[in-house]
Amino acid sequence: MNGAELKAILKDGGRVFGTMLSLSRNPRWLPVLDGVGLDYAVIDTEHGARSRGELGDFLTMMNTTGVVPIVRIPIPDSHYVTMAMAAGAQGILAPYCETVDEVKEVIGAAKWRPLKGDAVRRVVETGEHVSEATKAFLEERNKNSIAIIGIESVAAVKNLEAILDVPGIDGIFVGPNDMSISLGFPDQYDRPEYQSTVKHVIDTCEARGIACLVHHQNPELSSYWINQGARFILHGTDRRALTEGFRTEFTELRKVADDLPK
């Protein structure tokens, strides 16, 4: 799958499945992701420790698989967008966006690279292009580019309709930890206030034909939000998969050993 194919699935009302890679730095193991049921993976550079060179190697290897690489950039800034895309990302996730101006900057860099300055501002704000030839060239060049906007605070939710008016958004990301903290109930995901807020985000986005990602760590919570309408499904992390895999298997092995005669 590539970015254009992933976007087409979402546009048709389908679902795609992915995970977050926050711990891994060595790209040699990435080909195994091709057969585990992932459509995409988000490489976390907001919280994960990777150099620019390491990210480039990571993306080069991931692009040999059928898993679409999306980079979560540190902040909603055009410099980080273009840096990730130039390194080989087929999409970006811009965290903690609260204003229309932030979103316009991200979309301009993700969808119309390498256009800059006043030219990209006019494209994003008015749809005015330098020429039809330039428009066609940039659309073809960036056809795989995926732009995901992070809605992770009360302020962002209040501004959601205006943010969604910016053309070019392919997905809206809800970060449960940040959102619950902003609501005043850190990590209390069963609170009605949290659930109603996230449901409002999903419903508002779906009314515009935009799919949502709600990133939870356990299958029960991820399943809940799939049932509530999340279609851009983002579940778990490499760290959790490693931890839970070891815990499950070594618990089983210790039980076998404990059952043996002393």
Residues of each region from the PLM?
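Conserved anion-binding
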Residues: 79, 89-167, 181, 262
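N-terminal amphipathic alpha-helix/helix-capping segment at the start of soluble metabolic enzymes
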Residues: 1-20, 131-143, 199-200, 206-207, ...
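Alpha-helix-loop-beta-strand connector modules within alpha/beta enzyme cores
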Residues: 52-86, 108-118, 139-142, 190-213, ...
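Glycine-enriched alpha-helix->loop->beta-strand junction motifs that scaffold or abut catalytic
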Residues: 36-40, 86-91, 111-112, 165-171, ...
